[in-house]
Design a protein with these regions (language model features):
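Glycine-rich beta-strand-to-loop/alpha-helix junction loops that act as flexible
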Residues: 186-189
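A mid-sequence, solvent-exposed acidic-amphipathic segment
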Residues: 140, 146-182
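C-terminal functional extensions of proteins
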Residues: 191-244
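Structural signal for conserved beta-strand scaffold positions within catalytic alpha/beta enzyme cores
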Residues: 80, 134, 151-154, 210
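Structural motif
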Residues: 131, 182-183
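Residue-level detector of flexible, active-site-proximal loop/helix-junction positions
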Residues: 85, 157-159, 215
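A short, acidic, amphipathic alpha-helical segment used as a generic capping/interface helix at domain edges
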Residues: 6-10, 60-67, 165-175, 191-193
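Electropositive, gly/pro-rich neighborhoods at or near active sites that engage anionic ligands
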Residues: 1-147
Length: 244
């Protein structure tokens, strides 16, 4: 596995060279869906999501998400929790062993922690003169991002339960483009995994990137994660597999 900064450069180079790919990421949150572990947070205040494994509809939605996590394709990359790393909250060996093509695995933290400042500096330049759409919370102020967003596809809180239908809007949007490739940035929790997988299956001509909370400070006018404040994982370098 390349270092975190080299992995970031790998994906940035692909964007610069107009080589489409899909990058979806999952970690301890989606791990709860896989293992039916409840998650109870204040979604209204923090733009996060909850999970009640006693709710039958939520179980159905969780299956859609978790089924998508095993998808593999040549141009599709999964960001996972490191198999053996002191920085990651949970061991990623279970994630790692799901996939046959280990070459298409990367760090779930690729846009944050040790890479956070580089992403803030470099991604706006990489996206310059590109057609960019953003899929994220309706309260996100995308006009405050340090790059132009052509369109904002809005979802609400607990989007993985309430906004599955946005897939059709995204299909129509991507279908209206041929070249050059469009860049879709996703920041909608577990729903991102499902949307990116389904869209890539049908159209491999665009960039589908799970950007997560990397630019939350811009769109919400406040930090939502520890690394935004120089705390938590800020500056910490994932090791992938200790000793290798």
């Amino acid at each position: 596995m390349r270092s975190m900064d080299d992995e970031l450069d790998f994906f940035f180079d692909k964007i610069m060279d107009s080589e489409p790919f899909a990058l979806s990421r999952w970690g301890d949150g989606e791990y709860r869906l896989v293992n039916s572990i409840p998650l109870d947070r204040d979604a209204e205040q923090n733009h996060v999501w909850n999970f009640d494994p006693t709710d039958e509809y939520q179980i159905e939605c969780a299956k859609l998400i978790t089924d998508s996590l095993t998808y593999e394709d040549e141009g599709f990359y999964w960001g996972i929790t490191c198999p053996d790393c002191e920085v990651c909250n949970v061991s990623g060996w279970g994630h790692y062993n799901l996939y046959e093509n280990k070459e298409n695995l990367t760090y779930a933290s690729i846009f944050v922690n040790a890479n956070h400042e580089e992403v803030q500096r470099t991604l706006p330049y990489v996206l310059k003169d590109k057609t960019v759409a953003f899929v994220g919370n309706k309260s996100a102020k995308t006009n405050q991002l340090p790059f132009h967003v052509d369109r904002h596809f809005t979802v609400g809180n607990n989007a993985w339960i309430n906004d599955l239908g946005i897939l059709e809007d995204l299909r129509d949007y991507l279908g209206s483009f041929n070249t050059p490739p469009t860049i879709l940035l996703f920041a909608c929790g577990p729903l991102s995994n499902y949307l990116i997988t389904e869209l890539w299956k049908e159209n491999k001509g665009h960039f589908l990137i799970d950007i997560g909370s990397a630019f939350d400070v811009d769109i919400y006018n406040r930090p939502t994660r520890g690394f935004h404040r120089g705390k938590g994982g800020f500056g910490k370098i994932c090791q992938w597999i200790n000793g290798q």
